[in-house]
Amino acid sequence: WRKGQHTRHAQCVGVDAGIENPQRHLHQHTTLAVNSDTKGKLVDETYHFTGQHISEYDRTKAVAHDIANKFIAKELPLVVVMPGGIYGPGDTSTLRVNILDFLKGRLPMLPSQFGICLAHVEDTARGHLLAMEKGKPGESYIIAGEPHTMVDVFKLASQITGKRAPLTVPY
């Protein structure tokens, strides 16, 4: 599959399966991938990043989001959810790896300005269910908590564990 085309294929499945008049479809992105680097500016669901993406993953998620918007324009009852950095049981994210490295003393430094809005996996699942039950087709919903820098996250981890927080470097 060409990058980003999974969205087109997934949205066509319901039509091909003969599902008539579904109340809503659900499409998930992440806040990081869709919004890319906002240069520290807090944004809401209406924000659309138009600059150069910070990674290929980021770019292809934006392509998929554009495809989802085309389905919305064709009046497919699509609801978009955008979780923040998901954490919790079963976590395989970079954040988890960084925390484990920190606990083992193998995380020497952090970018000083990198921020993230975290979302616990149970809250994320609940947000998906609410979007399916009550979400307005054509709308997007961010599922995330307050923004934190990675420095904030690891200062808290340092306070909890008693381990020295990693050094920070400009980002």
Describe every region a protein language model picked out:
Residues 33-34, 86-88, 124, 148:
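Conserved sequence/active-site signature of Rossmann-fold short-chain dehydrogenase/reductase
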Residues 63, 94-95, 111-132, 139:
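Substrate-positioning beta->alpha
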Residues 60:
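Active-site helix of classical SDR
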Residues 48-52, 100-119, 123, 135:
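A conserved pocket-lining segment of Rossmann-fold NAD(P)-dependent short-chain dehydrogenase/reductase
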Residues 127-171:
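Mid/C-terminal beta-alpha module of Rossmann-like enzyme folds, strongest
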Residues 29, 66-89:
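Conserved beta-loop-beta element that borders a ligand/cofactor-binding pocket
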Residues 1-57:
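Conserved Rossmann-fold NAD(P)-dependent oxidoreductase catalytic core, especially the SDR/UDP-sugar
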